[in-house]
Amino acid sequence: MTAVTINVAVVDDDASVCRALERLLRASGFAPLTYLSAEAFLLDRPRVIVDCMILDIHLGGMSGFELQKQLAAAGSAPPIIFITAVDDPDTPELARQAGCVAYFRKPFPGHKLMETIRSAVAARNSN
């Protein structure tokens, strides 16, 4: 039986967060793709298959919410997990309204994120 590669895109303007998530994802058996901006992700999007996305809400330039809207409008939004370091009481509800599968405030437990990715990909593949 051949193992299925699960590509997980990470979009965060903090390079250290991208590196940490890349290591965690790789150690958990995922294939990480990291981007420091929404614009960089969009440039690469036609060439990559993304099974799940970890998306920072507050990016320089286009925000995570704006990127999610653009992907949804194009009909190409993978399951999205929003992350943020901002402690704003309205943000979790805004993230849910945007259609995310989960929302995590930094810092968050890595094992919970990995469980969420597995569940999101399994749910998407069962449809």
What are the roles of these predicted feature ranges?
Residues 56, 84:
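Active-site residues of response regulator receiver
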Residues 34-52:
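Acidic, metal-coordinating helix/loop segments flanking the phosphotransfer/catalytic sites
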Residues 5-15, 21-25:
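Conserved acidic segment of CheY-like receiver
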Residues 66, 87-102:
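Alpha4 helix (beta4-alpha4-beta5 surface) of REC/receiver domains from two-component response regulators
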Residues 36-37, 63-66:
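Acidic catalytic/metal-coordinating carboxylates
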Residues 18, 60:
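The feature encodes the CheY-like receiver
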Residues 65-76:
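Short amphipathic alpha-helix used as the core "switch/output" element in two-component signaling
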Residues 90, 108-118:
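C-terminal output helix
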